């Protein structure tokens, strides 16, 4: 059993972890970058609406491994979201006509101060345990099927009509 630590962090703090300590986005078990600009915009829409963007799972990299990887963390869950946040922060994509630098200061402050949950796997976590966590996160549960999503969209349209 892996003893994990939970913390709530601001988006700014999460981005700071990447720039200050390094986060490996590409451990062997991770898929590549698969989100498009629509997916990225939906994430930022959620942040600006004050909705949860889910938790991030990071593994503290063992010291000897950190020397070769040149980073202190690896992303176990939340890669697409974290790539989106760093890409936007670096002005590498446009969100509703704005790069990060073009955002009004009030919106920058909102984005940076938005809170999210981070689960940190300790340095002592073995590769086997990391893989078990990754599989459990990505395999467990039952996704909502398309019919339920369509029904919710129909209900939303009806609500919009009724004002």
Report each predicted region and the residues it spans.
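Basic- and aromatic-enriched surface patches that contact anionic nucleotides/nucleic acids
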Residues: 1-13, 19, 23-37, 41-163
């Amino acid at each position: 059993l892996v003893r994990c630590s939970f913390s709530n962090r601001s988006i700014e703090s999460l981005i700071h972890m990447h720039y200050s300590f390094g986060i490996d986005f590409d451990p062997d078990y991770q898929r590549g970058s698969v989100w498009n600009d629509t997916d990225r915009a939906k994430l930022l829409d959620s942040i600006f609406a004050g909705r949860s963007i889910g938790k991030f799972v990071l593994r503290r990299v063992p010291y000897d491994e950190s020397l070769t990887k040149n980073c202190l963390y690896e992303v176990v869950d939340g890669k697409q979201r974290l790539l989106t946040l760093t890409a936007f922060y670096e002005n590498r994509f446009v969100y509703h006509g704005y790069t990060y630098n073009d955002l009004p200061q009030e919106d920058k402050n909102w984005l940076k101060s938005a809170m999210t949950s981070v689960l940190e796997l300790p340095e002592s976590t073995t590769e086997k345990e990391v893989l078990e966590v990754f599989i459990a996160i990505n395999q467990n549960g039952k996704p909502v099927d398309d019919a339920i999503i369509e029904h919710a969209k129909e209900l939303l349209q009806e609500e919009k009509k009724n004002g």
